[in-house]
Amino acid sequence: MKNNLIILLILLVSFSCDQKKDNTNESYDLVILNGRVIDPETEFDDIANVGIKDGRIVAITKEPLEGTESVDATGKIVAPGFIDTHFHFQTPIGYSLGLRDGVTSSMDFEMGCAGSYIADWYEARAGKTQANYGIAVSHEFARAMFIDGSDGADYLVNGPIAAYTTRAKTGWSQTRPTLEQGNAILEELDKGLQAGAVGIGSTVGYMREGVSSREMFEVQRVAARYGRPTGAHTRYTLGNDTQENNGAQELVSNALALGAPAIVLHFNNSGWRLAHQMIIELQEQGHNIWGEIYPYAAGSTTINASFLEPESWID
């Protein structure tokens, strides 16, 4: 195998520096030799050899290993692949670029895909990438379907890209649904979870006027029935340090009341230290609450997002 990889990534395997170090006489399917093995979970960091059999790591050791195939990782880092929970570029070329950046599992827990098209979304990607992939069912697209009348397999099956069409209208963002519309939105989310969505993705921060606190709670309740997370671009983002944390607290308090997981998306805005402290302390108490950050200050979005309105904009 080629040995000129910049970063060598191991996919869907569990790392442990205590794993079967004495099995150095085994025959392995693949051995990775002389690399700097780093496991963030166990804090293992040393030059070592890795033995893989039947798709799993069975040895991490300084002893010599032999296998059917070998990779000389001298001067390289051997580490688990990254899981990106906020990956919108879910196309073959997007996955390919992600793999080159170390992302072996690409998920979209923010925008997602319309529930009625989740099965088609997965089918369109089957066998076409080496990456792991998944997508949430979209709160925003459910609102667009039943408030604005957006529908069409030609674009809604495309997940986040569909926003270029649905956001031409404004009901998805600004309108409170009727009782009938609200129930239809929840049914659409349930349909997506039944079809394999990894959770619910909500862009409530784009829909702060249209989505009531009751609606957000009921959206998270749907995910809770399946034990799956709701990821949210939280309400009041962009906002000041108090508003940002109030948005995170809405998502988290709903999750705690429902006994459900939650992901506070890109919480590194104003007041992020409090959001981080809240997440860490809840994790220490055993709650499945987590968050993500991005390494950049801002990204592009559609001009009719509610937080870009002059009365809402925060410099």
Which residues make up each language-model segment?
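Sec-dependent signal peptide recognition
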Residues: 2-8
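Histidine/acidic residue-rich metal-binding segments in metalloenzymes
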Residues: 176-203, 208-315
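Short active-site segment of divalent metal-dependent hydrolases/proteases
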Residues: 89-90, 236
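Histidine-rich, glycine-flanked metal-binding segment
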Residues: 22-32, 37-79
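Metallo-beta-lactamase
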Residues: 81-88
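Divalent-metal coordination cores built from histidine and acidic residues
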Residues: 73-78, 93-202, 220, 283, ...
